[in-house]
Amino acid sequence: VRNNVMPHLTISAIEARNVDVLIPAFEKVCREKLQPLDEKGVVNVNNAINIVSIGQLFPRVIYAAPVLNEYMMNLSISIYNEFTTIPETNISKFYQPYSWMPHITLGKCLDKEQMRQAFAVLQNLFMPIDGQIAKIGLSTVNPYREVLSVEL
């Protein structure tokens, strides 16, 4: 874990002059989309994730790839729709709905030999993983800092 950044799945990448302008939109998405109640008033979130493959973003990133499911796509759309209305913000073209590839970075800034070694290890050890998305967070990068998060 480099720079205290835990393994994570990035849903969106948003440039903003100040992270504080993003907090109300983040809270709204969390309140309206992440905690839906069923008819009995029970939280009903299908936050399953199935990590099925290993891949590479050339030239220096190796990642684990989850299957893009309805939950992740709906979350991506909700975040885009909510955050795109905030003045002086820009959402990366690589994280907009239908142009987003979910991935969990396992290593970055790898040279060719490190990449070969990583694939050799994972070829022997990787098995598909069924899990749950446990938390949604709003963070800054360079340096990394978690601003706000919601446990699911």
Positions of predicted regions on the chain:
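Histidine-dependent nucleotide/RNA phosphoesterase domain, centered on the 2H-phosphoesterase fold
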Residues: 1-152
